[in-house]
């Protein structure tokens, strides 16, 4: 397991238990730096791209969000293409249900094949849609984009921000837990997952 982590005091504290774990290699770096991404992709069978700028930061820094999320996607695609076994590497990109807009009737629940319908001023969804198109148009043999819902994380109630009013009154809430999201990513890497 190779982790590309932004070098911050918070991340160093959060991942301190893994620093001496021989099964985990931590690369302190930046998704916007190709060489950092390349270090992580070399020798990989799977690339799970779960990093980037997310809301609510995306609302405050829209230009940085678009730059970060699209540059990260391009760097991952380029790093995979640089590998001698590029056709064997499986890439999982985490998109967002925000790419398909608000959940008003008649589209209350997300489904495979929902059209792209970004809500106005949603720079996060714009960045994720552009990044998804980078993977879709990359020519990589094995890639998937999972348009994930919001993530319930332990400190969510400490995050008092106007983003909590983004859900329209007639909309629905679609959430997944941190644990379920991790379980999904782990299961994708199992050998019995079909090629298609």
Task: Walk through the language-model features, giving the residues of each.
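Conserved glycine-rich Rossmann-like NAD(P)H-binding loop of the short-chain dehydrogenase/reductase
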Residues: 1-10
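Alpha-helical substrate-binding/gating segment
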Residues: 153-154, 159-162, 171-196
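Conserved internal alpha-helix within the Rossmann fold of NAD(P)-dependent oxidoreductases
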Residues: 73-76, 132, 185
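Glycine-rich NAD(P)-binding loop of the Rossmann-fold in SDR/ketoreductase-type enzymes
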Residues: 32, 64-75, 118, 122, ...
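Conserved beta-loop-beta element that borders a ligand/cofactor-binding pocket
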Residues: 132-154
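NAD(P)H-binding glycine-rich loop region in Rossmannoid oxidoreductase-like domains
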Residues: 23, 28-68
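SDR active-site strand-loop-helix element
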Residues: 4, 47-53, 91-97, 101, ...
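Conserved Rossmann-fold NAD(P)-dependent oxidoreductase catalytic core, especially the SDR/UDP-sugar
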Residues: 71-121
């Amino acid at each position: 397991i190779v982790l590309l982590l932004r070098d911050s005091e918070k991340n160093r504290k959060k991942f301190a238990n893994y620093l001496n774990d021989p099964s985990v290699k931590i690369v302190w770096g930046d998704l916007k730096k190709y060489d950092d991404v390349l270090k992580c992709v070399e020798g990989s069978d799977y690339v799970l791209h779960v990093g980037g700028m997310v809301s609510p930061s995306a609302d405050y820094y829209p230009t940085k969000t678009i730059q970060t999320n699209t540059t990260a996607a391009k760097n991952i695609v380029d790093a995979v293409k640089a590998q001698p076994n590029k056709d064997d590497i499986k890439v999982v990109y985490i998109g967002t249900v925000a790419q398909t807009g608000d959940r008003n009737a008649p589209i209350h629940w997300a489904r495979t094949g929902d059209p792209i319908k970004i809500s106005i001023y949603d720079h996060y969804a714009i960045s994720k849609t552009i990044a998804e198109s980078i993977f879709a148009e990359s020519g990589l043999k094995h890639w998937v984009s999972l348009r994930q819902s919001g993530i319930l994380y332990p400190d969510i109630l400490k995050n008092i921000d106007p983003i909590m009013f983004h859900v329209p009154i007639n909309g629905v809430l679609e959430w997944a837990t941190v644990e379920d999201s991790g379980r999904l990513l782990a299961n994708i890497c199992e050998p019995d997952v079909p090629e298609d």
